[in-house]
């Protein structure tokens, strides 16, 4: 593998072309690959999106299980290998494109991927920032630190809170760096994402809820009653605390998704619209 790394030195590369530069680390453990596909629990009825297909170690197994496989890869050399490996699988389409520039399938789809670590958060935002999309579930291998941030009981990031209102996110297990080529500097984790059957809020409230989440989580370590006093009156906050069954010291980052649903519903029902916090506007092309 070292010889392969050497050939990229001093060479000008497009985004995602080299595993080392893109943060892409290819899996080579067959048992691990089979475990990932098994845990994804896919069937002939599923459309599977693979982001960062690499040389096709995962793609070829997915092609035998799914009804349709959309394998995205930006490295021209890998695309050639993928094309040869999947030539006998008519259900598999190779998409030669930057992951962040693709259009997600309009139909319901599943994601099974070993994603490039360098763009972990942008990929998650692409998949989860629109709860009305066709994304249903996924098994994603990512950097362990990112996996822990996305699944922590203490929530610091507004986008993570928004994701978890509509999706369950959990770590299946950790994966040693020795299962990858080139091996990353950090360990990895297998993460399961599942759309909630009974989400606490309708997806039509996503933008309004994101505004509340961004406002509240600017200071996740302070008490909720202090952070939200710009929205609720003292009397409203008193009733809200009773509804949430919390004391005055309960901090913003420790609330559950169901508690956030109560806060949001209370705001929309009893607070004048002009007092609702607004979500930050995204720049063109920003996720």
Swiss-Prot record:
Residues bound to S-adenosyl-L-methionine: 25, 27, 52, 73, 98, 114
GO BP field: response to antibiotic
CDD domains associated with the record: AdoMet_MTases (cd02440)
Gene3D superfamilies per record: Ribosomal RNA adenine dimethylase-like, domain 2, Vaccinia Virus protein VP39
Compositionally biased intervals (Basic residues): 1-13
PROSITE patterns per the UniProt record, alphabetical: RRNA_A_DIMETH, SAM_RNA_A_N6_MT
Region (Disordered): 1-21
Pfam families from the UniProt entry: RrnaAD
Coiled-coil residue spans: none
GO molecular-function term, one example from the UniProt record: rRNA (adenine-N6,N6-)-dimethyltransferase activity
Enzyme Commission code(s) on record: 2.1.1.-
Xref: InterPro entries: KsgA/Erm, rRNA_Ade_diMease-like_C, rRNA_Ade_Mease_Trfase_CS, rRNA_Ade_methylase_Trfase_N, SAM-dependent_MTases_sf
Keywords tagged on the record: Antibiotic resistance, Methyltransferase, RNA-binding, S-adenosyl-L-methionine, Transferase
Membrane-crossing residue ranges in chain numbering: none
Family designation: Belongs to the class I-like SAM-binding methyltransferase superfamily. rRNA adenine N(6)-methyltransferase family.
Assembly, per entry: Homodimer.
Function as written in the Swiss-Prot or TrEMBL entry: Involved in erythromycin resistance.
Name of the protein in question: rRNA adenine N-6-methyltransferase
Organism whose genome encodes this protein: Bacillus anthracis
Gene: ermJ
């Amino acid at each position: 593998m070292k010889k392969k790394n050497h050939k990229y030195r001093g060479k000008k590369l497009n985004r995602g072309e080299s595993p080392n530069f893109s943060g892409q680390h290819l899996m080579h453990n067959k048992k691990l690959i089979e475990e990932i596909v098994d845990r994804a629990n896919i069937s002939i009825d599923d459309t599977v999106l693979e982001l960062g297909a690499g040389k096709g170690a995962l793609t070829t197994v997915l092609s035998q299980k799914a009804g349709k496989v959309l394998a995205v890869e930006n490295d021209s050399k890998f695309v050639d290998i993928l094309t040869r490996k999947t030539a006998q699988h008519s259900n598999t389409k190779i998409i030669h494109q930057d992951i962040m520039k693709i259009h997600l399938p309009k139909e319901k789809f599943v994601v099974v991927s070993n994603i490039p670590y360098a763009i972990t958060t942008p990929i998650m935002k692409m998949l989860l920032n629109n709860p009305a999309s066709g994304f249903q579930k996924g098994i994603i291998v990512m950097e362990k630190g990112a996996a822990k941030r996305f699944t922590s009981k203490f929530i610091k990031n507004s986008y993570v809170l928004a994701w978890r209102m509509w999706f369950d996110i959990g770590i299946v297990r950790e994966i040693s760096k020795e299962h990858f080529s080139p091996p990353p500097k950090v360990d990895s984790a297998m993460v399961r994402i599942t759309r909630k059957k009974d989400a606490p809020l309708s997806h039509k409230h996503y933008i309004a809820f994101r505004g509340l989440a961004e406002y509240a989580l600017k200071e996740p370590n302070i008490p909720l009653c202090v952070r939200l006093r710009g929205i609720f009156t003292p009397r409203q906050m008193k009733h809200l605390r009773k509804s949430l069954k919390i004391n005055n010291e309960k901090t913003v980052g420790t609330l559950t998704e169901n508690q956030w649903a109560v806060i949001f519903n209370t705001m929309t029902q009893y607070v004048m619209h002009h007092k609702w916090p607004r979500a930050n506007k995204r720049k063109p092309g920003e996720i």
